[in-house]
Regions:
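Alpha/beta-hydrolase-fold enzymes
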Residues: 8-85
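Acidic beta-to-alpha connecting loop that harbors the catalytic carboxylate
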Residues: 132-134, 160
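Conserved alpha/beta-hydrolase "acid-adjacent" motif
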Residues: 135-141
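Active-site nucleophile elbow and catalytic-triad environment of alpha/beta-hydrolase enzymes
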Residues: 81, 97-118
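Short beta-strand/loop motif that positions the catalytic acidic residue
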Residues: 128-130
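Catalytic active-site module of serine/aspartate enzymes centered on a nucleophile-bearing elbow/loop
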Residues: 143-181
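Short, proline-enriched alpha-helix->beta-strand connector loops that line the catalytic pocket
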Residues: 93, 120-126, 149-150
Length: 181
């Protein structure tokens, strides 16, 4: 706290909880169960499926309906495309290590628990921003962390789920401008 003037936490909870870990677990299983991975190869089918599972955690039903409601099969094609694209820029081992590292995120570890760790932030002007349709890190988790930290809380309204912080740039800009004048 003594080195930070202001803090913004955007679409992230104080710890990687059981819901978010479950998505990572399924993604890892997709890779580990790929017969190619078991032979020591890159696991293309498992990696593509892992990315599809992850994409489902980053998005929300409202956004899928708005974009592909008239042609639902295009949503499936989109997930396949994302999986194929992912293969060109990520290695299975890197993905496994990164997802396990994410699962260990817990600001309370070694600090007396989450509540105690967040109380230390009360001396810092802080803003926590949740997203109303975020399936990965539900708004209530971010709001709960903000309350424990004695921080302000704002919420992005969007049909795009967790990815809204990347898509709803006007809302993000408005929220940040109000906090970081």
């Amino acid at each position: 706290p003594e080195r930070v003037k202001k803090l913004v936490v955007l679409a992230a909870p104080a710890r990687h909880g059981p819901w978010a870990r479950a998505f990572n677990h399924l993604s890892r299983q997709a890779i580990l169960q790929d017969p190619e991975y078991q032979k020591g190869n890159p696991a293309p089918k498992g990696m593509a499926l892992a990315r599809g599972i992850a994409m489902m955690s980053y998005r929300a039903p409202e956004g899928f309906e708005a974009r592909w409601g008239a042609e639902p099969e295009l949503g499936e094609t989109y997930l396949d495309y994302q999986g194929e694209k992912f293969l060109r820029r990520f290695h299975a081992e890197s993905y496994l290590v990164l997802s396990r590292a994410m699962d260990t995120h817990d600001v309370g570890r070694g600090r007396g628990g989450v509540e105690e760790a967040l109380k230390r932030l009360r001396a810092i002007p802080s803003l926590f921003v949740g997203i109303d349709t975020d399936l990965l890190y539900p708004a209530w988790e971010v709001r709960q962390a903000a309350k424990a930290a004695g921080a302000r809380y704002r919420e992005i309204k969007s049909p795009h789920g967790h990815d809204a912080f990347l898509i709803e740039t006007d809302q993000v800009e408005e929220i940040l401008d109000a906090f970081l004048p």
